[in-house]
Amino acid sequence: MNILGRLGGALLGGSFAVFGYGAVRDPAALAKLAGPALEEIRKVVPLPKDDELLVRVNGAVQTGAGAALAIGLFPRTSALALAGSLIPTTYAGHPFWTIEDPAQRKAQRTQFLKNAAMLGGLLVVAGAGRKGAASGTGISAG
């Protein structure tokens, strides 16, 4: 694995591991923030009513898959797990389209777009083929 692949995996995966661990340890504030979005999702997906449990489960996925990606273990699988986790996290955590205050709306839009960029990076890793891929990163060298 080349140095850029190692660094990229460590930065991308490590960020998820840290944020996920925080959600597992202290889910209350995130559960409150996610509550309205979870209610919307429950209209089409049968989720448990315990918002803190859902935040903890999502955090555990991010912690485990983030750590795996950070060390180059199953990078494509880890990236897919993180991508699947990031979509509801972004929808629930950064609904800038619902915010009236211009400054808060701009801040939440920035966070939404940051998550979209992270999702893009995860999709690059998940979609990279094995042939010609940088060892352990899933990212094509060409």
Stretches with model-predicted labels:
Residues 1-142:
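Short amphipathic, positively biased membrane-proximal segments
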